[in-house]
């Protein structure tokens, strides 16, 4: 009630009309709250802007006029997470002392439902999905939202107070939170990522830390004891810490002992019964268990999911086998750590398809994981760097192609029966695609064309 009264007094400006901006504007308008919209794309080419205009919302397209702040007496700016803080409208808001939100903050204000906030440099989507499936298997009321594809404000707006909103959170989204308080929060891991956006490692860490910062002593922070950065970031919060560890035997929390997955000293199931592929997924599994056991889930619910859940699309997803060659779609691998984990999952010869947006980093950190790689097909802005890497390692076949489709056919031509053909780009997709999903779907389509 208090949150709703706060919202009713505000004048909002929505900056950027992707899914989250459109949803935020629509919800605020429906609630009778003052809202205006600004988007770079020209109005005549902008279907979401046209739809909002038809609802009676003021929409300004094609430019970013700072006069909108005075014209509409704006008190809060909600920006698309991907819009950089260097944007003129964001800079103007900060100059005026106007709070800059992402729609995650709005989602928090729209509901009395309980949030589970999941962030990390890698593994977010798999872990978020595991948590959601485990809560459902336990017959708890759960919704899934955030960076996983479902707009959080939309989910929150329609949520009941007794539901869990299992929310995948990017650093971009968390930067625009100021009061957002999950009852259960999780940072899976932290390493250098998105430094083109955050500029420094410190800024990136501060964004991730926001998932812990506003929690109270009655909340729970799920903490990866194997990641020194996560342990340090959790210390700034007030929540009770629930640990998990892949490498240590713990007195409480989630861990592995004698090939058995444990929680608080109680055996849940043998590791060999888990069907999710890839050693790297153990971190995601233990984190998910720590979350759902904290939320009161039964061991039976956890077991039911772990003995049936085989993974998420675009995350080391098995596609098919063609003439003895196994194809895997790991398009979600938008950084080096994700690709190194994918490569670690195979002990058979691998043909690696990689490349994408150039964020200025090198790829030397991949070298220790390339021992099974027999060929590299590169594409996108980073193709020259990955080509250089392959040549330095003395990989027999290193070839630059124009796109994912060409990479698939070239990889198949170079392959033998028993080989793994792996799309794991180690780069974001935005140089050639709108999303990593689009890139993964193109890979899947190209693979099926081989049959």
Swiss-Prot record:
Gene3D superfamilies found in the cross-reference section: Mur ligase, C-terminal domain (3.90.190.20), Mur-like, catalytic domain (3.40.1190.10), NAD(P)-binding Rossmann-like Domain (3.40.50.720)
Principal location: cytoplasm
This protein's pathway: Cell wall biogenesis; peptidoglycan biosynthesis
GO cellular component: cytoplasm
One MF term in the entry's GO annotations: UDP-N-acetylmuramoylalanine-D-glutamate ligase activity
Gene Ontology process terms (BP): cell division; cell wall organization; peptidoglycan biosynthetic process; regulation of cell shape
Binding site for ATP: 120-126
Membrane among keywords: no
Entry EC number(s): 6.3.2.9
Keywords: ATP-binding, Cell cycle, Cell division, Cell shape, Cell wall biogenesis/degradation, Cytoplasm, Ligase, Nucleotide-binding, Peptidoglycan synthesis
Catalysis performed (reactions): UDP-N-acetyl-alpha-D-muramoyl-L-alanine + D-glutamate + ATP = UDP-N-acetyl-alpha-D-muramoyl-L-alanyl-D-glutamate + ADP + phosphate + H(+)
Function: Cell wall formation. Catalyzes the addition of glutamate to the nucleotide precursor UDP-N-acetylmuramoyl-L-alanine (UMA).
NCBIfam families: murD
Family the UniProt entry places it in: Belongs to the MurCDEF family.
Name the record gives this protein: UDP-N-acetylmuramoylalanine--D-glutamate ligase
Protein source organism: Bacillus subtilis (strain 168)
Name of the gene encoding the protein in the UniProt record: murD
